[in-house]
């Protein structure tokens, strides 16, 4: 499945960065733009994309430093991996795909990138239109975050690329607790963890994981802007799909958004933890399909 996903996409030069882009479905200037999370990649969404099929144009790419996109080893976080830079690249992805309006889907770290794009729309400076936003399991409300042990270890490291790769098995096992009970019991978890780790370790990507994780510090710096957008976004409908068992982006975060913005649609996913697109891809895809006609 991983090899097929890679073969279906293409690495493009966007804003001067080599970015892996997977596009599917009928050609259209209206489509679904998906932003993945940390430490995932576009591959996390292959089940969702497959289930949507020919019902919509779907574009999902690997962020800089992730998956098959470029993973510079010679920069700092500020010069190479900021969420603002990632948002700029997603503008370029949409432009290159010919998208003028999108149903935006964003997860985890990508949730903050999505909120930056949403903030730009509210300010009238986004070059395409978000007509519906679906946000899922992410700790943009960083004052409520529950860091995983792997995250704590990586954050303690300096802002330079490591000289050696991380231990593959240790990294893989660090992801295991972030999956919910239903998926863990399905028999698919081990294969999924291997595929996810391969995406991280491709082209020495594990060496920049500690640098990229500094996005948590950027979230603190941008807390006012992105939380305000979360709570007051007016220019399109907002839907939250959230795993009840998420140990990092806890369900209380979704409850808080619902309290602050009561007209938000919130769907709590029982038995699901941090990776809804992997754990319940058909459910997630159906939620996207149901919102394709949003004005």
Predicted regions and their residues:
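Short beta-strand element of the alpha/beta-hydrolase
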Residues: 29-36
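Catalytic histidine-centered segment of alpha/beta-hydrolase-like enzymes
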Residues: 272-285
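Conserved hydrophobic "DFG−1" position in protein kinase catalytic cores
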Residues: 21-23
């Amino acid at each position: 499945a991983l090899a097929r996903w890679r073969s279906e996409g293409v690495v493009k030069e966007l804003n001067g960065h080599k970015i892996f882009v997977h596009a599917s479905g009928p050609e259209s200037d209206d489509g679904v733009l998906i932003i993945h999370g940390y430490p995932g990649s576009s591959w996390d969404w292959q089940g969702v994309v497959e289930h949507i099929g020919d019902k919509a144009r779907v574009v999902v790419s690997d962020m800089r430093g992730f998956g098959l996109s470029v993973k510079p080893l010679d920069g700092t976080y500020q010069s190479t991996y900021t969420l603002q830079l990632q948002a700029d690249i997603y503008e370029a992805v949409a432009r290159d795909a010919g998208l003028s309006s999108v149903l935006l889907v964003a997860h985890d770290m990508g949730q903050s990138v999505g909120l930056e794009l949403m903030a730009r729309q509210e300010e009238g400076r986004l070059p395409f239109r978000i007509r519906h936003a679906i946000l899922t399991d992410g700790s943009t409300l960083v004052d409520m975050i529950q860091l995983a042990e792997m995250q704590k270890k990586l954050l303690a490291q300096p802002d330079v690329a490591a000289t050696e790769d991380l231990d593959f098995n240790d990294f893989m096992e660090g992801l295991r607790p972030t999956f919910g009970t239903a998926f863990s019991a399905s028999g698919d978890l081990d294969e999924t963890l291997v595929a996810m780790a391969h995406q991280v370790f491709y082209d020495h990507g594990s060496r920049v994981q500690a640098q990229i994780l500094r996005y948590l510090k950027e979230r603190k710096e941008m807390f006012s802007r992105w939380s305000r957008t979360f709570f007051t976004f007016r220019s399109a409908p907002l839907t939250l799909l959230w795993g009840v068992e998420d140990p990092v982006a806890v369900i209380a975060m979704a409850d808080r958004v619902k309290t602050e913005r009561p007209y938000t649609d919130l769907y709590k996913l029982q038995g699901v933890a941090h990776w809804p697109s992997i754990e319940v891809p058909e459910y997630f895809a159906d939620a996207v399909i149901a919102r394709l006609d949003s004005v």
